[in-house]
A protein has these predicted regions:
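Short strand-edge motifs at loop-to-beta-strand transitions and within beta-strands
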Residues: 33-37, 126-130, 214-218
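Surface-exposed, short loops/turns at beta-strand junctions within beta-sandwich domains
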Residues: 39-47, 131-139, 219-229
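Flexible, low-complexity linkers/stalks enriched in Thr/Pro that connect modular domains
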Residues: 56-62, 66-77, 90, 148, ...
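Short proline/glycine-enriched turn/loop motifs at strand-loop junctions of beta-rich domains
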Residues: 7-13, 99-105, 191-197
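Structural beta-strand segments of beta-rich domains
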Residues: 2-4, 92-96, 184-188
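Short, solvent-exposed loop/linker segments at the N-terminal edge
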Residues: 86-92, 178-184
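Proline-enriched interdomain boundary motifs that mark the N-terminal boundary
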Residues: 75-84, 167-176
Length: 236
C-alpha cells in the first residue's frame, strides 16, 4: 500500500483508481493543491496501473492523470545454495560459490551474523561468488541470503561448515641416524605431527611420502653409491 503524492486543483477531491477500481479519495491542499493518498486496499501482486481524477466543488471531474505503473512483488526469492564443498582450507579468505535468484543481492553470514559483504548473482544463471573478510583459524558456519529488487529476503541457505587452518605443522625430525650404510634402500624414520603427510627428499628429489602417526617410516627407492642429503617436510 504505497503512498501516492501529486498535485491537483486546490481544494478538489482526488480519487485514486487502479484501472476502473476506486482505491479511495482525499482532498488536495486548498492552497498548493498537493495531495497524498494511500490505497484503501492492498495492491495486487504484479503490475498495477494507478491514475487519479480531480472533482471540483460543483462536481466537475477532470480526465484521469497519466498512469503510474507499480509492480508489486511480495514473494521472497527461493532459498539460495552454496555449491562450494570445501570443509578444510588454509585460505583465510576462501571464495564461496553458489546459485541464487538471478540478479538478486547475495549477503554473506558467518555463524548467523551478517558480514555486510554482498555480491550480485548473475542476471541469467544466478551464479555468484563471494569472499569473506579474513577469518581467524577455527570452525565456521557460512550461509547466504538473497534479496530481490523489491527488497524481499529469502530464507538462509544451508550452512557450509568450514575450518580454516593456516598454521603449518611442526618441523619434522629425521630420527634415523645412518651416516654410512650398505643398504641401497634404507628405511628412514621421521617424527612429525600426527596426521601430517611427510615427504622425504634427497637433494630436492622426492624419495617417498607417508602419513605420520607421530612417527612415519619411509623406505627409499634404490640408491646408487654416493652421498645423499636427506630432508623431510610435513604438510597438514
Amino acid at each position: 500500500t504505497p503512498i501516492i503524492i501529486g498535485t491537483a486543483e486546490a481544494g478538489s477531491t482526488v480519487e485514486l483508481l487502479n484501472g476502473d477500481a476506486s482505491l479511495g479519495t482525499t482532498t488536495a491542499d486548498a492552497t498548493t493543491g498537493i495531495f497524498s493518498i494511500t490505497p484503501s486496499s492492498e495492491l495486487s501482486e504484479g503490475l498495477n496501473s494507478l491514475t487519479v481524477t480531480a472533482t471540483d466543488e460543483v462536481g466537475n471531474t477532470s480526465s484521469a492523470s497519466s498512469a503510474l505503473s507499480i509492480t508489486v512483488d511480495t514473494t521472497a526469492p527461493a532459498q539460495p545454495s552454496i555449491t562450494t564443498t570445501t570443509s578444510l582450507t588454509n585460505d583465510a579468505t576462501p571464495t564461496i560459490e553458489g546459485i541464487a535468484e538471478a540478479g538478486s543481492t547475495v549477503t554473506l553470514f558467518v555463524d548467523g551474523v551478517t558480514t555486510g559483504i554482498t555480491t550480485t548473482a548473475d542476471g541469467t544463471t544466478g551464479a555468484y561468488t563471494i569472499t569473506p573478510a579474513e577469518l581467524s583459524d577455527g570452525a565456521y558456519a557460512l550461509t547466504v541470503t538473497a534479496t530481490d529488487t523489491a527488497g524481499n529476503i529469502s530464507a538462509a541457505s544451508s550452512a557450509l561448515s568450514i575450518t580454516v587452518d593456516t598454521t603449518a605443522p611442526g618441523q619434522p625430525v629425521i630420527a634415523t641416524n645412518i651416516a654410512n650404510t650398505t643398504d641401497s634402500t634404507p628405511t628412514i624414520v621421521i617424527s612429525a605431527d600426527a596426521g601430517s603427510t611427510v615427504t622425504l627428499y634427497s637433494n630436492g628429489t622426492v624419495l617417498g611420502t607417508g602419513v605420520a602417526n607421530s612417527l612415519v617410516t619411509i623406505t627409499t627407492p634404490q640408491l646408487g653409491d654416493g652421498d645423499y642429503d636427506i630432508t623431510a617436510t610435513a604438510t597438514d
